[in-house]
């Protein structure tokens, strides 16, 4: 699975993240701040199904038209996170190599200036 995301509008991604954030906050707050009907098992199941639907929309590589189990959706999410970690690790490694090369160049330039001046 590649870590390349299909083109999505910024507003739809922002709305999805806000929706997930609100649901996460309501779960973290506990039962005293939950809305009506959320304490019931069916309400919780409905919320979880909504979360899985959002994951299917947001994670690239999940076939949109197919019926996947929750475990399959989570496996796609885990694979996508792993792919992102690899890409970020490669970017950090390239940045450190470039910074090292840049510092070597500046040291050489400084040494060259010193020999010309003295």
From Swiss-Prot:
Pfam families: HLH
Top-rank lineage group of the source organism: Eukaryota
Physiological role: Transcriptional regulator (lacking a basic DNA binding domain) which negatively regulates the basic helix-loop-helix (bHLH) transcription factors by forming heterodimers and inhibiting their DNA binding and transcriptional activity. Influences cell fate decisions in the embryo by sequestering and blocking the activity of the bHLH transcription factors that control these decisions. Inhibits the binding of myogenic bHLH-containing complexes to E-box DNA, thereby preventing activation of muscle-specific target genes. Also inhibits the activity of neurogenic factor neurod1/neuroD.
Membrane-spanning intervals of the chain: none
Domain bHLH: 32-84
Native organism taxonomy: Eukaryota, Metazoa, Chordata, Craniata, Vertebrata
Disulfide bonds, paired cysteine numbers: none
Keywords: Biological rhythms, Developmental protein, Nucleus, Repressor, Transcription, Transcription regulation
Any GO BP annotation: rhythmic process
Name of the protein described by the UniProt record: DNA-binding protein inhibitor ID-3
Organism this protein belongs to: Xenopus tropicalis
Claim: Transcription regulation is one of the keywords in the record: yes
């Amino acid at each position: 699975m590649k870590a390349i995301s299909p083109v999505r509008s910024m507003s739809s991604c922002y709305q999805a993240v806000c929706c997930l954030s609100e649901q996460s906050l309501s779960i973290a707050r506990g039962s005293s701040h939950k809305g009506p009907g959320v304490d019931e098992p069916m309400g919780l199941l409905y919320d979880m199904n909504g979360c899985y639907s959002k994951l299917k929309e947001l994670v690239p590589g999940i076939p949109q038209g197919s019926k996947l189990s929750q475990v399959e959706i989570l496996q796609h999410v885990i694979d996508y996170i792993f792919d992102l970690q690899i890409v970020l690790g490669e970017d950090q490694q390239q940045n450190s190599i470039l910074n090292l090369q840049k510092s070597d160049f500046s040291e050489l330039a400084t040494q060259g200036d010193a020999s010309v001046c003295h």
